[in-house]
Structures are given as structure tokens and as C-alpha cells.
UniProtKB/Swiss-Prot annotation:
The keyword Zinc-finger does not apply. Binds DNA as homodimer. Interacts with protein E1; this interaction greatly increases E1 DNA-binding activity. Interacts with protein L1; this interaction enhances E2-dependent replication and transcription activation. Interacts with protein L2; this interaction inhibits E2 transcriptional activity but not DNA replication function E2. Interacts with protein E7; this interaction inhibits E7 oncogenic activity. Interacts with host TAF1; this interaction modulates E2-dependent transcriptional regulation. Interacts with host BRD4; this interaction mediates E2 transcriptional activation function. Residues 309-391 are annotated as: DNA-binding domain. Pfam families: PPV_E2_C, PPV_E2_N. It is found in: Host nucleus. This is Regulatory protein E2. GO terms for biological process: DNA replication; DNA-templated transcription; regulation of DNA replication; viral DNA genome replication. Residues 1-202 are annotated as: Transactivation domain. Belongs to the papillomaviridae E2 protein family. The keyword Transcription regulation applies. GO terms for cellular component: host cell nucleus. Residues 200-303 are annotated as: Disordered. Residues 200-209, 221-235 have a biased composition (Low complexity).
């Protein structure tokens, strides 16, 4: 144990000397990582022997020492191959060769002369992100292990470099906009220059949506849904026969306008929440369960013919996530939404613990503003629709 403690002290003393020296020579950085590797190997062995302390040093868990030793080996080998290149005579400091620099995008490359790039998604300061564009990037050829020095570049699409005539993106603003933006637009601020970019819609159905309902952060798809229709032939238009229905009908049943398709999450179908309606005496509601197909329209909205309907959003997901989200949006009440329900579940199910929270809006415009300004957390699914207004 005493021998191990002496060796560990000598290793740590060497590390301190390298930190104080603050050299800019590559051979000193290789020596530094060799000592880090040796230190973690000794701590790993000490833990295997059941030791929790070696002198004044606490011995970490085996997995911690092993992971740090593997990282040190990886960086040391990369620096040793860099030492054999034409760039070994350049200045290399501890900061240039640290693990954080090695793992920063683009990963497994060495970088120098970084500058900040500010990207404002949707043109909003509330949705801006800062990225690092590198002046020079040192890329290793995976076949020959040789290193190549290429300039880092930035444009409206992202951060990238060109190696052997191939563009390699390490930050894609289009992909980032799916996380931080809504409308698919962003501004790139770099070195006093502003680059504007307008992106295409995320999905084809969003691209063909009508102008009166802007894009939302929800990916949409078209799905057939049941829609109320009248029993009489007049509701189907002149010259067309009424489709077969599966409901009790009467001659006094009211007519309804043509149904529209609903917005749903891709790969899932959710029926429109049923609402209770008072039907006049002697009248019976009639529903047609035909599939709705209209290739000339791609407006994925709920069909509704009730004048007393209000736009809503049903949030579906984990109960705790819903509660946190409801608490977070309370400050927007009466501005971005009118009412919000408590967390609710479907009764008599198959044991599914999925929860829901319903938000009411005074208008479709208010709901659109809500979707534009409020980001729906990951794990929650937003289901826009309509419900009958009741108190």
C-alpha cells in the first residue's frame, strides 16, 4: 500500500508541475495525458484491492476510474498521431487538448480559434441559441491516420467544414429548429453579419395547410374521422346519392355542413371528443361513419358545425409532466388561453396510466398564438380539436 501511495503521489506531483508550466508544446500535452492515464489505472487497482483511500486521495468507484482511464488513452493516442503530422510544431496548450475540446462538435477532432454564432429561431430573442464556429479544424483520416487542417465555415444552413471535397455538417440549423423553433425560420448572427433563412415546412401536410391556420409545432397527418351528416339526400348535394349510414335517423334531423379532417399525431388516430348536446323532442341525431376523402384539400382541421363549439387542445402524456406544464403556463391565462382543466384519465380502460389536460381558447387565433409562443415539452402530445361550450 505504501508503494502504491508513493507512486500515486509522484504521478500527481508531475501533473501539478505540468499545470504550473502551462506549456504550449504538444509533447508536454502527451505527457499530461499519459500521467492522467497512469493515475486512473492506479486508482482502479486500488479499488480492486478494496481500498477506499490512498494517502489523501479518495478512491472512486471502479467504473469511474475505468471510464477516465479509457478517455485518457483515447486522447493520448490521438495526440501521438498528431505529433507525427506537420502540425506538431504549432502551439498546443492544455486548453487546446482537453477532453471537452475533443468531445465538442465536431467530435473526435481538434479545434482552434472558436467564435460564437447566435441563432434566433423564429426571429425571437426568447428562442436563441449560441453555437461555436471554429476557425480551424484538425480532421483525422480514418484510413491513413493522417491529419488535415481545414477551415470551419458557417452559412444559413449550419456550421460545417469541407474535407476532401465533401461538406461535413456538425451543427444543422434545420434540425435544431425542430427543437427550439416553430415556424421553421431563423436568423444567424456571426461577426456582425445577419443571415436570414426561411425553411420549408416540417411535413408535407403542414406545407399545404391553409393560410388561416399557421404552422404549429405539431407534426400533422390526415386521418378519416366520423362526421355528423344529415339523413336527407339534400345534405349530399344535388345529383348525388346519400352514403349509407349507421345510425337511427328521422326526417327532422338537422343538416350539418361538410365535415373536415382532423389534426392528429403521425402514426396515431384519436377520435374527436364527444360532447353532450340537447336534442329537441321528436328529433334524433344521425351520424355517418363514412371515410372522408378529399384530395383537393389538405387543411387538417377538425370538422365541426356547432356554433357553440370552442377550440381546445388536449395534452396527452405523463401525469407529472402535465402538472408541471400546467403550472408553467398559468402566467399566460386569459392571454394565451381561457381555461385549463385538472389532470384527468379515461375510466374503465385497460390499465393505461396516460393522463390528459384540456385547455380552452376563446378563438382559433388564440390557440394558434398559444402554439406559436409556448413550446410543448417532449413526451407530451398536443391534440387540437373542438368541444361544445359548457359552463
Amino acid at each position: 500500500m505504501e508503494t502504491l501511495a508513493n507512486r500515486l503521489d509522484a504521478c500527481q506531483e508531475t501533473l501539478l508541475e505540468l499545470y504550473e508550466k502551462d506549456s504550449n508544446k504538444l509533447e508536454d500535452q502527451i505527457k499530461h495525458w499519459a500521467q492522467v492515464r497512469l493515475e486512473n489505472v492506479m486508482l482502479f487497482k486500488a479499488r480492486e484491492c478494496g481500498m477506499t483511500r490512498v494517502g489523501c486521495t479518495a478512491v472512486p468507484a471502479l467504473t469511474v476510474s475505468k471510464a477516465k482511464a479509457c478517455q485518457a488513452i483515447e486522447v493520448q493516442l490521438a495526440l501521438q498521431t498528431l505529433m507525427q503530422s506537420a502540425y506538431s510544431t504549432e502551439a498546443w496548450t492544455l486548453r487546446d487538448t482537453c477532453l471537452e475540446m475533443w468531445d465538442a462538435p465536431p467530435k473526435k477532432c481538434w479545434k482552434k480559434k472558436g467564435q460564437s454564432v447566435l441563432v434566433k429561431f423564429d426571429g425571437s430573442s426568447d428562442r436563441d441559441m449560441i453555437y461555436t464556429s471554429w476557425g480551424f479544424i484538425y480532421v483525422q483520416d480514418t484510413i491513413t491516420d493522417s491529419w488535415h487542417k481545414v477551415p470551419g465555415q458557417v452559412d444559413e444552413l449550419g456550421l460545417y467544414y469541407v474535407h476532401d471535397g465533401v461538406r461535413v455538417n456538425y451543427v444543422d440549423f434545420g434540425t435544431e429548429s425542430l427543437t427550439y423553433g416553430v415556424t421553421g425560420t431563423w436568423e444567424v448572427h456571426v461577426a456582425g453579419t445577419v443571415i436570414h433563412h426561411t425553411s420549408a415546412s416540417v411535413s408535407s401536410t403542414q406545407a399545404s395547410a391553409s393560410d388561416d391556420e399557421p404552422l404549429s409545432p405539431i407534426r400533422t397527418a390526415v386521418s378519416p374521422v366520423p362526421a355528423p351528416v344529415a339523413a336527407s339526400a339534400e345534405s349530399t348535394g344535388a345529383g348525388r346519392a346519400a352514403p349509407p349510414t349507421q345510425a337511427l335517423c328521422s326526417a327532422q334531423a338537422p343538416t350539418s355542413p361538410p365535415a373536415k379532417r382532423q389534426r392528429v399525431i403521425v402514426g396515431q388516430q384519436h377520435p374527436r371528443p364527444d360532447s353532450t348536446r340537447t336534442v329537441g323532442e321528436g328529433e334524433v341525431e344521425c351520424y355517418n361513419k363514412r371515410s372522408i376523402s378529399d384530395s383537393n384539400r389538405t387543411d387538417p382541421r377538425w370538422g365541426h358545425g356547432d356554433t357553440d363549439s370552442v377550440p381546445v387542445i388536449h395534452l396527452r402524456g405523463d401525469a407529472n409532466c402535465l402538472k408541471c406544464f400546467r403550472y408553467r403556463v398559468q402566467k399566460h391565462k386569459d392571454v394565451l388561453y381561457a381555461r385549463v382543466s385538472s389532470t384527468w384519465h379515461w375510466a374503465g380502460g385497460n390499465g393505461d396510466k396516460t393522463a390528459f389536460v384540456t385547455l380552452w381558447y376563446t378563438s382559433v387565433e388564440q390557440r394558434t398564438e398559444f402554439l406559436t409562443r409556448v413550446s410543448i415539452p417532449k413526451g407530451l402530445i398536443a391534440l387540437p380539436g373542438y368541444m361544445s361550450a359548457f359552463v
